[in-house]
Amino acid sequence: MASRPAGDLSAGEVPTRDIGPVTHSGVVLAVDIGGTKMEAGVVDGRGRIVVRERAATPTSDDPEQVFAALREIVTGVLGASPVPPERCGVGCGGPMGHGGETVSPLNIRGWRRFPLRERLADLCGMDVVVDNDAKALALGEGWTGAARGSADYLAMVVSTGVGGGIVLDGRLLDGTAGNAGHIGHVVVEPDGRPCVCGGRGCLEAEASGTAIAAATGRPAAEADESVRRRCGTMVGRAVASVANLLDLQLAVVAGSVALGYGDDFFDAARQEIALRCGLEFARPTQIRPGGLGADGPLVGAAAVARLGSGLVAGAGVVEDGG
């Protein structure tokens, strides 16, 4: 079912969206927009990418220049697709206005309250559903990835920035304005580095690719073992806080930094989780790499489109037969 208006919620009920099973058939247009790159693709009913294009995200302050780059790859995949998509799903960095009407990604300077949904709908001539990119990943990992079959989990992206999405009782948490799960701004070092949000010591300021490059003076991909392990420790600290708070026992972590740092990152994260999850219900908490690899952002965006169809019920995502 689709998100319900706040007025339809019982007192104290958290607004959520059911993650499945999804019965909507057919292909969808999937769009992922990040601070470093943007990508568009056509995805079928089993989560397979039929065609895709990507481009670097412009660093311009001009919102139209950023959208022009997006327009080029979207029109490219629509022209190359053997089957016309039925609807469009978008994963974009946050924060964003409720329902994804406007987006203000912290790592895309040119977009502040940019009307992305309306502009894409006008471009594509189809319904467009926009959500946070990490929440999109959470849907994708539950559909065909490392969280498939799990009803309670945290999904994270550790890349240019850090984001997250939370699924509890088989339902994706939205929150008041649709930004639930924004784990990048959980404080992991109270007197830590300044963050773009205005705070200090946020996970994104300590463990994102941007923060690591700024602190070391070289690309995050060239970080030595101590930096890779510190990144994992910071992420493990944040995961432990979420596990202790929400009684979930699985964190799935994707993104170029986390996956690129590999065992150094995940071993350090596991050690930190073991150190900080002392309560009996939290001790089994696991952290594992995302199962979708480089396809994760587009599969997640496709899951956003399929969820937006409204044809969902129960817990757990299933494949279409086509």
Region locations from a protein language model:
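ATP-binding/phosphotransfer module of carbohydrate and carboxylate kinases, centering on a glycine-rich
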Residues: A2-R87, G97-G100, E118-M126, G140-S150, ...
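Short beta-strand segments
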Residues: D32, G89-G93, A155-G161, G165-V167
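Glycine/small-residue-rich loop that forms an oxyanion/phosphate-binding "nest" at active or ligand-binding sites
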Residues: K135, L139
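A charged helix-plus-loop insertion that forms the helical arch/lid used to bind
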Residues: E101-R112
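General beta-strand structural signal in soluble alpha/beta enzymes
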Residues: V128-N132
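Short, intrinsically disordered, charge-biased short linear motifs at domain edges
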Residues: N179-V188
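Glycine-rich beta-alpha junction loops
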Residues: G94, T160-V162, G178, G201, ...
